[in-house]
Amino acid sequence: MDLATMLQNLVTEGGSIGWGLYYLGKLLGAGVAMGIGAIGPGVGEGNIGAHAMDAMARQPEMSGNLTTRMLLAMAVTESTGLYSLVVALILLFVLP
């Protein structure tokens, strides 16, 4: 028995309590997806910024090149946070 069937049985047999549990699960799942999905980009962007500032302090003549690479790395790192946002929105609005 797969998870979708189990949820459907819970909803149909549980009445209003089943629907409440179902929506509670959707909300908790979306919250956990965004919460955990935001930790990685936050830590990663902090490390990128700290190391870029350290590199610029050591070699000021390379600051333009380092800034470009830092912004590119931050954009790639932030994409995982956006993916978790998409998953949370799917959990909230797309799944029945």
UniProtKB/Swiss-Prot annotation:
The chain crosses the membrane at residues 28-50, 75-95. Coiled coil: none annotated. Its main location: membrane. GO terms for molecular function: lipid binding; proton-transporting ATP synthase activity, rotational mechanism. The record marks E78 as: Reversibly protonated during proton transport. It is a multi-pass membrane protein. InterPro entries: ATP_synth_csu_bac/chlpt, ATP_synth_F0_csu, ATP_synth_F0_csu_DDCD_BS, ATP_synth_F0_csu_sf, ATPase_proteolipid_c-like_dom, F/V-ATP_Csub_sf. It is found in: Cell inner membrane. It comes from the Bacteria. One of its GO terms (cellular component) is proton-transporting ATP synthase complex. Keywords: ATP synthesis, Cell inner membrane, Cell membrane, CF(0), Hydrogen ion transport, Ion transport, Lipid-binding, Membrane, Transmembrane, Transmembrane helix, Transport. Belongs to the ATPase C chain family. F(1)F(0) ATP synthase produces ATP from ADP in the presence of a proton or sodium gradient. F-type ATPases consist of two structural domains, F(1) containing the extramembraneous catalytic core and F(0) containing the membrane proton channel, linked together by a central stalk and a peripheral stalk. During catalysis, ATP synthesis in the catalytic domain of F(1) is coupled via a rotary mechanism of the central stalk subunits to proton translocation. F-type ATPases have 2 components, F(1) - the catalytic core - and F(0) - the membrane proton channel. F(1) has five subunits: alpha(3), beta(3), gamma(1), delta(1), epsilon(1). F(0) has three main subunits: a(1), b(2) and c(10-14). The alpha and beta chains form an alternating ring which encloses part of the gamma chain. F(1) is attached to F(0) by a central stalk formed by the gamma and epsilon chains, while a peripheral stalk is formed by the delta and b chains. HAMAP family: ATP_synth_c_bact. This is ATP synthase subunit c.
